[in-house]
Amino acid sequence: MSGIKRTIKETDPDYEDVSVALPNKRHKAIESSARDAAVQKIETIIKEQFALEMKNKEHEIDVIDQRLIEARRMMDKLRACIVANYYASAGLLKVSEGLKTFDPMAFNHPAIKKFLESPSRSSSPTNQRSETPSANHSESDSLSQHNDFLSDKDNNSNVDVEERPPSTGEQRPSRKAGRDTSSISGSHKRELRNADLTGDETSRLFVKKTIVVGNVSKYIPPDKREENDQSTHKWMVYVRGSRREPSINHFVKKVWFFLHPSYKPNDLVEVREPPFHLTRRGWGEFPVRVQVHFKDSQNKRIDIIHNLKLDRTYTGLQTLGAETVVDVELHRHSLGEDSVYPQSSESDVCDAPPPTLTLPAAVKASAVAQSPEPAAAAPVGEGFPETTEAERHSTFYSLPSSLERTPTKVTTAQKVTFSSHGNSAFQPIASSCKIVPQSQVPNPESPGKSFQPITMSCKIVSGSPISTPSPSPLPRTPTSTPVHLKQGTASSGVSNPHVIVDKPGQVIGASTPSTGSPTSKLPVASQASQGTGSPIPKIHGSSFLTSTVKQEESLFASMPPLCPIGSHPKVQSPKAVTGGLGAFTKVIIKQEPGEAPHVSTTGAASQSAFPQYVTVKGGHMIAVSPQKQVISAGEGTTQSPKIAPSKVVGVPVGSALPSTVKQAVAISSGQILVAKASSSVTKAVGPKQVVTQGVAKAIVSGGGGTIVAQPVQTLTKTQVTAAGPQKSGSQGSVMATLQLPATNLANLANLPPGTKLYLTTNSKNPSGKGKLLLIPQGAILRATNNANLQSGSAAAGGSGSSGAGGGSGGGGGSGAGGTPSTSGPGGGPQHLTYTSYILKQTPQGTFLVGQPSPQTPGKQLTTASVVQGTLGVSSSSAQGQQTLKVISGQKTTLFTQAATAGQASLLKLPDNTLKSVPAAPQLAKPGTTMLRVAGGVITAAPSPAVAFSANGAVHQSEGSTPVSSSVGSIIKTPGQPQVCVSQATMATCKGPAAVAGTAASLVSAPSSISGKATVSGLLKVHSAQSSPQQAVLTIPSQLKPLSINTSGGVQTVLMPVNKVVQSFSTSKLPTTVLPISVPNQAAPSSAPVAIAKVKTEPETPGPNCISQENQVAVKTEESSELSNYVIKVDHLETIQQLLTAVVKKIPLITAKGDDASCFSAKSLEQYYGWNIGKRRAAEWQRAMTVRKVLQEILEKNPRFHHLTPLKTKHIAHWCRCHGYTPPDPESLRHDGDSIEDVLTQIDSEPECLSSFSTADDLCRKLEDLQQFQKREPENEEEVDILSLSEPLKTNIKKEQEEKQEEMRFYLPPTPGSGFVGDITQKIGITLQPVALHRNMYASVVEDMILKATEQLVSDILRQALAVGYQTASPNRIPKEITVSNIHQAICNIPFLDFLTNKHMGRLNEDQ
C-alpha cells in the first residue's frame, strides 16, 4: 500500500526513491511503484523540456517580432529617404533639362505665363500650390513651405506656400517640401527668369515684386507661462517674397516693425538681416505697420499694415494667422544683380556670385529659421538650416551642384543661426537654438548680423512656434524638406520629428510625426532647411560639416520646434538627447542667456507637450520608438517620456496618469528621473505597480504627490508589474525590500512637502549597491485604496495618489491585498498593512517592486523568501508628522524623531545577545528612544515592557496575546506594546497601535505569520505609538552604509527631517522608525528556513561589542540629533559656531570606531590612498550629513530660527577652508609657484616682512631685565614660603585620611595634563583629582583645560587658515599661515577680543 501511496504526483522527485527502499514490502508493489515513479519522472522531465522549448520558441518569436518591427521602421525611414531623394534629384535633373516638369508653368507659352504666374497668384488659395501637383494645400503645407522657403530662400517656387491660406487637411507638406526643395534649383532659375520676364512685360524700367507679410502664432497654455509674463500667445511676423521668389533679401535692406504702444519702449523694431522675422509674446491682436526699406535708395520705403491674427483655437499649436500680399514696382536696374543671384535663379551657374549667393544662403538659412516659426517645418530648417540643407543636398541630391553650393550654404546656416539668435533677445521660442555660424563672414551682410541677434526672430526657430503646427492634423514639414516623414502615419504618440544629422550628409532619423495628433505636426525640419532654390543648399555633407559651427548645434536648433515653444524651459541638458529619435548623436542646446529656457533638452525635451504613450505588454515594456509610439488609449496619462533610443518607458498599464499630469520623463541611461507633473497626482488604476527599472536616482521634491521636475535629468525605466506578490526570485536577485505599512505610508505622505526620502540600497549585487532612491514624498505613499500602486515605486517616477486619502494623512494608503486600510483622519490606522517594496535587480536595472501583503489575518505571505537586505520604511501614524531621519554613520543609524520629543533614551544592546532590559520603563516615556544596534538586535519599546528572548520567541510582556514563537513571526497585537527581537535582528516598537514587524523580509502581514523567512539582516522598528518618540537604530558600522563595498553594507535611509519637523500637524502619532535593513552577506536563502542568525560582516563584532556588554543603562540624550551626533547648543549662537560644533562631531578622518561614519577614513594615509573621486565623495557625504544635522538643530531650537541653513556646497567649502578636509595632495605638489601665486603673495604680504625667529633672544633679554629690576624687598619671598608651607600641611592631612579610608587609586596624568597641573600650581591654584568611580581618581580638570586650550588654538589656527584661503589665488591652498593671518583670525573671532587691545583702557596722560 505504501508503495501505492507514494505515487502521489506532487511528491518531490528527489524523494521518490523512498518507496523503493522500504523493506519487507511486497516486491511487486515495490517494482510497480518504482515503475510508476520512473514513468512519472520521465513524464515530468519531458513536460519540463517541452515547456522550456516552448518558452524558448516564444522568446524567439518575440525577438523576431521585435526585429520585424525594427526592420519595418527602417524600411519606412528608407522609403522616406528614397522618396525625398527622388524628388530632390528629380528636381535637380529637371532643372538642368529646363525645368519642364518641374514647373507646371513650364508648359505655358511665355505670352500667357505672366497672367498665370502673377504674384497675386500665390495669395489665391487655388493657385497657391499651382506648382505642386496636388491641388489641396494645407495650411500646414503652406507653413512647411513657408519654412521651406524660409529655409531655402531660393526656393521661390515653393515658398509661395506661405501665402496660401492654411488648410489643415494637407498631409503632403513634407512631400511638397521635399519637392520644393528639389524644385528649388529649378524654380530658382525659373524665378529669376520669371522675375525678369514679369518685369519686362510690365515695363522696361520697373520690376514687379511681391512682398508677403504674414504672421504665425501659438497659444501659450497658462501652465507654461512665466510668472512675470502672462502673455497668452507667442507670435511671429514675417516678411517674405512670393512663393515663386521667397527671398527678398537681395532688394530689401531692412524692415521696421511698428508694434502696439503697449510694447514701449521697444515698439519699433528694426530687422536688418535676411530672415525678416519678428517674434514676440502678447495677449492681443493689433495692426502692425511694417515698413520695408529697399537697398536702392531710388525705391522709396513702403508701409504695409498687417493685422496680427492670433490663434483662436487655443490648441497650443502653431497656426498661421493671416497674410497681407503687396505688389511693389521696383527699379529694374536696382535689381540687376537679382537676375544674377543664384538664389533667385536656382541655376547653379549663379555660383559665380558667391558672395551674393552667400547672402542668399544666409537668407535661406534665416528663412529656414523663420519658416520654423510659421511651420513646424521651420523649426527644422531653422535649427538645422545648414545642416538640413546640406544634408539634404548631400543626401538627397547627390549632385555636384549640391556640392557647389556648399560654401554658401554653410553660411546660410550660420546666418540663420544668428538670426535665431538675435531673436533670443525676445523670449522667442528659438531660445535654445543658438547656432553660431561658424563663418558668417561670407555673407556680405554679415556685419549686420551682430545686430541681428537682437532683432532676429530667428530665435523662434528653436522653440519655433512652428513646432506647433496649426491645428491641422498633419504634421507640417517644411516644404522644402525632402525628407518625408511619413505624414500619414498617425502614431498615437507624437513623435517629434527631429532630424539630427549624424554625419554631415545624412539625415539620421526623422521621426515620423504622427498625423493624428496636432502635435505630430512637427515636420522634420532638417530637410526643410535646405533652400530649394538656393545654391547654397547644395553643400555636400562634408563641407557643410566643416562650415557649420557645430553640427549638433544646428541640429539642435532645428530640433527645438519639437517642443512646444515654451514648453520645457527646464530641461536643458547637454546630454544626448533622449528625444524622439534614437538617432541623434549629440544635440547640444545652448541657451541664450536672455532666453527663456524654452528649449527643451535636446530635441527630446520638448516632447512633454505631446504625450507619448508606451504600451506595456504583459509585464514587459515595449520599447517605443519615438516614431511610433503606441499609446494605450485607455490611459489618460500624459506622461511623455523622452525616450532615448534604446530606452523603454513603460507606463503602468492600468494606471492612468491624470491627463493633467504631464510628466516629462527623460530617460537615459543612468540618470535621474525627473517628472514634471502638474498638480495632479497620478492615480493608479487597478492593481498595477509602477516599477522603476533602472533608476539610479529619482528625486522628487515638493510634496503633494506631485513630482517636480528638477533640472536633473534622470531616466528611469518604469515597468509595470502586476500587483500580486512578486516572487522574489522571478526577476533577478532581490536587492532590498522596502516594507511599508500602509498606514505608515500615509504617515510618510504626511511629511511636509519638502521632505525627501532617500533609500539607499546595498547589496551583494554590485549593481544594487549604493543606489540611492529618493522616494518622492508625494509619491510616497498615497496608495490608492484598491490599487496598490506603490508610489514607493515613486522612485520610478509615478506618484500615486490615494484616491481615498488624497489628503495628507487622511486616508491611509491601502494595504496590500487591496483591502483599504481605513484610518480616520484623526485616528490611528486600524489596519496596518505593509506593502513591501523589493528592490529587484534585473538585467534591466534595479527597481523597486511593490509587494502587497495580503491583509486578511491568518494569511501568510508565501513569498517568504529571503531578501537580501530589506529596507522597511514604515511610519505608523496616519498623520503624525513625524520626521524620520535615518542617517548612516559608521553604524548606520536609523532615526526617527517625533516632533514633540521629550527625552531620548538610549538603549544599547550587546551584540547578538538579547537581554531583557530593565530599563524598559524609562523607555516608555514618550521621549525619543535611541536604539543602538550593536550586533544585530535592536529593541526599543516605548511601552513599559520589553522582553527579549534569546531564542527569538517573543514573550509579550503585557501578555495580551501570545506570540507565536516562530522566529521571524510576530503577531500584531493591537494596542500591545511589544518588542520582539528575534535573532534575526528585528525589533518593533509598538505603541498603542501595535505594528507588527517581522523579521522575515517579505513576510510582513499584520496578521501572524507563520512562514519564517530568513532575513538576512533586517532591522525593522515600527512604532505605532501615539506618543511621539524617537527611535534610533544604529546599525553597526560594519555594514558600511552608502559605501559601495561589495559586501552588503547597510544602506541608509535618509529622510531628512528638516522640513518635517516644522509641521506639527494634527496627528500625534509618532513616526515610526524606518527599518533599515542591513543587507548582510548572508546569501538569501530562498527556502523559508528560519535562520534567525544574521550574518554580519566579518568585521562586525569588533567595535560594537566592546563596552556594550552590560551597558543596558539607558542614556538619555539631550538632543535627538541625528543618530549618534549629540551636540550641545546652549552656548552656541552663530551659524559658524554651530557649524564648527557639528563638523567636529562628524570627522572625515578618525581612528575611533565610534565617530566613524560611512565616509570617514581611519587615517590620513588611508584618505590620501583614495582616488580623488572617492575623496570628493566622502567630503560631500560629510558635508551633507553636517547640513542635515545643522538643519535639524536650526529647526529644533527656536533661537536659531533666524539663521539660514547653509547649502551642502557652502559647507564643503567651509570645511576645506577651515582645515576639516585635508587638502588634496595633488595641489600640494606644486613646487614651482606660478607667477600669479607669487604676485598674490607679494600683494598679500605686509609691508614689513616678519621673519620667524626662536624665542631665545627674547627670553634672554627678559631675564636680564628681571635681574636688573630685582629691587623688591625680600620679605615677599618669606611670605611666599609661608604660603607654601600651609598647603603642605593640608597634604599631610589628606594622607592620614587616606590611611584611614580604603585604598585610593589615582590614574596617572597624561603628559599634557601634568603640564597643565604644573602651570596652575605655579599661579597658586591646585586642581583636585576628581572621583571617577569609588576610590578611582583622575585629573579630569587638567584634561578639560588642556582640551579647551587645544580647541582655542585650533579655532584660531583654522580661522587663520580660512583667512589664508581668502588671500591665496583661487583653487590654491595657502602655502603657509603667516603672522598676519593669525592676527586677522584673532580679530575676526569676537570672543578672542581679550587677546587684542580692543577694549584696553588708556591713561589720561596718554590722550
From Swiss-Prot:
Q: Name one GO molecular function term.
A: TBP-class protein binding
Coiled-coil annotated residue ranges, if any: 54-80
Query: Where on this protein does the Glycyl lysine isopeptide (Lys-Gly) (interchain with G-Cter in SUMO2) crosslink form?
Result: 9, 113, 189, 486, 550, 590, 647, 771, 908, 1095, 1115, 1207, 1270
State the signal peptide span: none
| Annotated region described as Disordered, given as residue ranges | 116-196, 462-540, 791-833
Composition bias (Gly residues) maps to 795-829
| UniProt keyword Coiled coil present | yes
Record text about domains: The YEATS domain specifically recognizes and binds crotonylated histones.
Specify the protein name: YEATS domain-containing protein 2
Q: What organism does this protein naturally occur in? A: Mus musculus (Mouse)
What are the top taxonomic ranks of the organism? Eukaryota, Metazoa, Chordata, Craniata, Vertebrata
What gene, per UniProt, encodes this protein?
Yeats2
